[in-house]
């Protein structure tokens, strides 16, 4: 709390102590501005001071006057992707912004699996890091800080992607941005605002959590830590709110591990968080997120329930989920090292859904409905592409239960886009589960290589007792 107070005090002191034109940290040299859109440039100055903004992409001068609160803002229309450009902002002083690109800008947020970089220990990235001199990709790393109320500025700066800067930046975000750059052939700006260990509550405006009894109660169950905040709104206020004037194309999100203990309210919380961000940006942002990978949690099935909650969030328009139950190299490590496939899958989803490109295997198969005929169950799915396939034994991971709610392993057969199941122990099937546990590794894929999301067809009570 003291750090938050000092940060806020510093910003106020800084803004009031100098009668010069100033910019927020996110507006600077090396930045990427969203193409073919109206973007905002804003800052602070002396009330009544005239501010002129000139850009090298159109050569015109846009003018405004600092208002009575010491703030100014200019709206600029950006052209199609290109650059580098320059921007000159002139008041009582002059600020020159150099090496500015225009392209696609994405915010990347969540907890440690989004924060995870090459320097955290990902030797498989070595070749990609060595080839990462990609000046068309730019990074903005938001420094980790909290605040009691929404802030107007934050700490961070833009940098050019190279073999050094990439080592410290989110691996998932890098691979996401690289695939976008490869396929769209436009500059990509990546803003990383992530913090390991954080629950979704702290990335959500506090009033949204506190005014909902169920969300407020769930937030009180979160485990405190000296290393990351858990208080509703704290990271939203300090790390997201200051960015909401900055035009972006969309958001990617990798989080959920710290909410496994409150999975029953997660879909409501997460959906509310997404809607709050969209309201803040005044845009229905595409929002693509990563499903939890297999991991040995201390309580049974809590990750399965959280994954289920993540899938429920797909009810929101312009959302998408990346399934990762095939990417866990070690289920005792909460940080799977394969970040490349995660980033690429996020990018393929964005390329297909946001940019309308014909991308094969952009979506994972999802359970749709089932049909029972005697002792046989037929499962139907969405997003199956050209069909389904199995790696290894087809029935692995499938379980059937009757009305007694006792689950037994099933024998499975794939027929194009459907799967049929039977079990000698279940004569009248009532429910099916697939990979529905903390550590289950999936082996059913679309023929395009995308893993089937874990699911259950029932809504029965799930055992979440401690693992012994």
Positions of PLM-derived features:
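Cell-envelope and extracellular/periplasmic
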Residues: 20-468
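Bacterial Sec-dependent N-terminal signal peptides
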Residues: 1-22
């Amino acid at each position: 709390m003291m750090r938050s107070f000092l940060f806020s005090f510093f910003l106020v002191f800084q803004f009031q102590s100098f009668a010069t034109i100033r910019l927020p940290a996110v507006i600077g040299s090396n930045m990427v501005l969203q193409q073919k859109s109206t973007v905002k440039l804003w800052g602070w100055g002396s009330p009544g001071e005239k501010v002129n903004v000139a850009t090298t992409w159109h050569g015109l001068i846009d003018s405004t006057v600092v208002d009575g609160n010491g703030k100014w803002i200019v709206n600029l229309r950006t052209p199609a992707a290109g650059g580098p450009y320059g921007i000159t902002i002139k008041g009582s002083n002059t600020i020159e912004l150099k090496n500015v690109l225009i392209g696609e800008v994405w915010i990347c947020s969540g907890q440690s699996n989004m924060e995870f970089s090459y320097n955290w220990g990902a030797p498989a990235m070595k070749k990609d890091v060595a080839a990462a001199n990609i000046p068309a990709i730019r990074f903005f790393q938001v420094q980790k800080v909290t605040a009691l109320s929404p802030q107007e500025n934050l700490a961070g700066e833009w940098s050019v992607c190279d073999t050094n800067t990439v080592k410290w930046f989110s691996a998932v975000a890098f691979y996401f941005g690289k695939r976008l750059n490869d396929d769209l052939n436009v500059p990509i700006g990546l803003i990383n605002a992530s913090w390991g260990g954080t629950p979704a509550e702290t990335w959500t405006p506090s009033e949204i959590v506190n005014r909902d009894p169920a969300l407020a109660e769930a937030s009180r169950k979160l485990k405190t830590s000296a290393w990351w905040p858990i208080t509703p709104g704290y990271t939203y206020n300090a790390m997201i709110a200051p960015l909401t004037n900055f035009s972006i194309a969309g958001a990617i999100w990798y989080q959920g591990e710290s909410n496994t203990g409150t999975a029953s309210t997660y879909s409501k919380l997460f959906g509310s968080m997404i809607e709050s961000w969209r309201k803040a940006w005044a845009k229905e942002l595409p929002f693509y997120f990563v499903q939890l990978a297999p991991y040995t949690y201390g309580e049974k099935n809590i990750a399965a329930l959280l994954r289920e909650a993540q899938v429920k969030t797909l009810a929101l328009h312009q959302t998408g989920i990346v399934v990762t139950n095939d990417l866990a190299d070690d289920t005792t490590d909460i940080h799977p090292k394969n970040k490349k496939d995660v980033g690429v899958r996020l990018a393929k989803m964005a390329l297909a859904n946001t940019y309308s490109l014909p991308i094969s295997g952009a979506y994972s198969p999802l359970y749709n409905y089932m049909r029972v005929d005697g002792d046989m169950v037929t499962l139907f799915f969405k997003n199956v592409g050209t069909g389904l396939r199995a790696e290894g034994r087809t029935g692995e991971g499938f379980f059937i239960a009757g009305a007694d709610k006792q689950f037994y392993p099933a024998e499975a057969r794939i027929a194009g886009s459907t799967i049929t199941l039977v079990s000698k122990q279940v004569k009248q099937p009532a429910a099916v589960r697939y990979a529905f546990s903390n550590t289950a590794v999936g082996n059913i894929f679309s023929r395009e290589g995308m893993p089937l999301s874990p699911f259950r067809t029932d809504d029965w009570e799930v055992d979440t007792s401690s693992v012994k």
